[in-house]
């Protein structure tokens, strides 16, 4: 089994109305419960807006701190889920299900394992 990162990318701007967001969150909770029951769920979390980020950069002996996101963009990492799956196809299926619930782009990426692949 391998771990995969399912990254949720959301656009800048106003979040959905409360009634829409409540429905999404309920469906997201049901999907998380299904992932747990299948032994696939490892961890998940939502992130605050990019404006709350702090970037740390070590440069020639100095630690530089910058407020705001590392890169400016129209979409940003809004949350993520880590799943354990036997193969990429299984991880992609969880990613597909997540994309259907949140209606946002999902990037599926495997973690580097100890063997280095």
Feature locations, PLM:
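Conserved, structured core segments of small domains
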Residues: 1-117
